[in-house]
Amino acid sequence: MKTVQFFFLFCCWKAICCNSCELTNITIAIEKEECRFCISINTTWCAGYCYTRDLVYKDPARPNIQKTCTFKELVYETVRVPGCAHHADSLYTYPVATQCHCGKCDSDSTDCTVRGLGPSYCSFGEMKE
């Protein structure tokens, strides 16, 4: 019986204390309207799981905030998109996560939808290598 209790406590501790929200390398498609194509770049972003719960009884006095794995700190990097027309602005600035945490999704800076377009979406349909 003590083994079952220990295992249960261990699982609870693991779920609460050991959030696996961490930096991960991803490839994103970047595009410039003036260039009419996309290129792929490697960057760092946050991914993983956070402890959350959905209460059965909704309490209007206590808002239900679902925590998500999101950035805590960002830096911005700039890359020159090759092959653009000479008159076009070929610089593209994108965010790079440097620290992650479990927190409320900030819809002012993040796509908080269930199914966003995804990091490899290209509206022009053409990827250049």
Curated annotation (Swiss-Prot):
Range of residues in the leader sequence: 1-20
The source's superkingdom equals: Eukaryota
Transferase listed as a keyword = no
Q: Which GO terms describe its cellular component?
A: cytoplasm; extracellular space; follicle-stimulating hormone complex
Q: Which SMART domains match?
A: GHB
Query: Which residues are noted as glycosylation sites?
Result: 25, 42
What are the GO MF terms of this UniProt record? follicle-stimulating hormone activity
PROSITE patterns assigned? GLYCO_HORMONE_BETA_1, GLYCO_HORMONE_BETA_2
Q: Name one Pfam family in it.
A: Cys_knot
Q: Where in the cell is it found?
A: Secreted
Looking up SUPFAM superfamilies in the UniProt record yields: Cystine-knot cytokines (SSF57501)
**Alphabetical keyword list:** Disulfide bond, Glycoprotein, Hormone, Secreted, Signal
User: Which residues span the membrane?
Assistant: none
Which InterPro entries has this protein been placed in?
Cystine-knot_cytokine, Glyco_hormone_CN, Gonadotropin_bsu, Gonadotropin_bsu_CS
List all disulphide bridges recorded for this chain: 21-69, 35-84, 38-122, 46-100, 50-102, 105-112
Please, one GO biological process term?
Answer: regulation of signaling receptor activity
**Main location (coarse class):** secreted
Subunit-level organization: Heterodimer. The active follitropin is a heterodimer composed of an alpha chain/CGA shared with other hormones and a unique beta chain/FSHB shown here.
Give the family from UniProt.
Belongs to the glycoprotein hormones subunit beta family.
Q: What does this protein do?
A: Together with the alpha chain CGA constitutes follitropin, the follicle-stimulating hormone, and provides its biological specificity to the hormone heterodimer. Binds FSHR, a G protein-coupled receptor, on target cells to activate downstream signaling pathways. Follitropin is involved in follicle development and spermatogenesis in reproductive organs.
Write down what this protein is called: Follitropin subunit beta
Tell me which species this is from: Pongo pygmaeus
Encoding gene, per UniProt annotation:
FSHB
